[in-house]
Amino acid sequence: MKILVTGGAGFIGSHIVEYLVQRGDDVTILDNLNTGKIENLSKVNNDINFVNGDIREYKLLEKLVSDSDGVFHEAALASVQQSLKMKDEYFDVNVSGTENILKLAKEYGFKVVYASSSSVYGNPKQIPIKESDDRSTVNPYAQTKLEAELLAEKYSEMGVKVIGLRYFNVFGKRQSKEYAGVIKLFLDRIQQRKPPKINGDGLQTRDFVYIDDVVKANILAMDSDINYKFLNVGSGLPISILDLANLVIDASGLSLKPIYCPALSGDIKTTQADLTSIKKLLGWQPKTKLRDWLIEVISSKKFECI
């Protein structure tokens, strides 16, 4: 297949690229290197076509997708805290940029699998969260993801093949410093023999899913006969931030206690994915357990894995 990966030098995108190259696909990457890094592609540099550009550049996008079989759309701005200060920029990239891809999909007929987010649910009324549950955002980043979903719905009615994967909290190697998740932040502190810092009371829960499992969900979605759907991608196994901090400390063998800091604006209290749909429709299920991965990384000091 001939595939374009937007944001292909980023955390999730670069792992998708590696999988596609290994499979033998013809892969082009579009990335402006705002948070992505060329070194993330070091394993596949000789097997890809890399274009330094922006998803807001319509003519450039058109040139790249006109003969594509599919697009994995991972390019986005993804910091909740940053979105509070840069609302217009976030809308421009995450909404207008996504619409560019959907417009071109309508014209050229390729399938789109793109990164949505569990943040579209806001603070859920019930746990676990099903795809049919209410969407009620609590920060500008989440609102851009919801607006992109509304566009996907609109374009699907025009015949565009599009699947939105609602990522929960993805962890693994290559997370950028700008968008680092709490696991990376905790492990960075432990590596320095410093205690993890917790924002708020630590009782907020998160649903963590490993990067390799996320890649597999993307591949299955693209290869499926499904033409339109939103699907949760998580582990279905929530853990509180306090329990996560203590797990990291225990695995390190250090005598530390978490440091409590003020809660973050726009933070969600609890989240947990219902995986019924993605298991049924794609035959997907997560394989990597957070606890096992953390113990392996910390006990063997494989901090390059973050």
Model-predicted segments: where are they?
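Amphipathic terminal alpha-helices
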Residues: 290-306
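Conserved mid-core alpha-helix of short-chain dehydrogenase/reductase
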Residues: 60, 100-104, 208, 213-216, ...
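Active-site loop of classical SDR/Rossmann-like NAD(P)-dependent oxidoreductases
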Residues: 35-37, 181, 241, 262-277
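Glycine/proline-rich active-site loop of Rossmann-fold NAD(P)-dependent oxidoreductases
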Residues: 146, 161, 170-185, 194-195, ...
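Non-catalytic, hydrophobic alpha-helical segments
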Residues: 214, 218, 233, 244, ...
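Hydrophobic alpha-helix immediately C-terminal to the catalytic Tyr-X-X-X-Lys motif of short-chain
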Residues: 147, 151, 155, 186, ...
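PAPS/PAP-binding and catalytic site of the sulfotransferase fold
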Residues: 240-252, 293
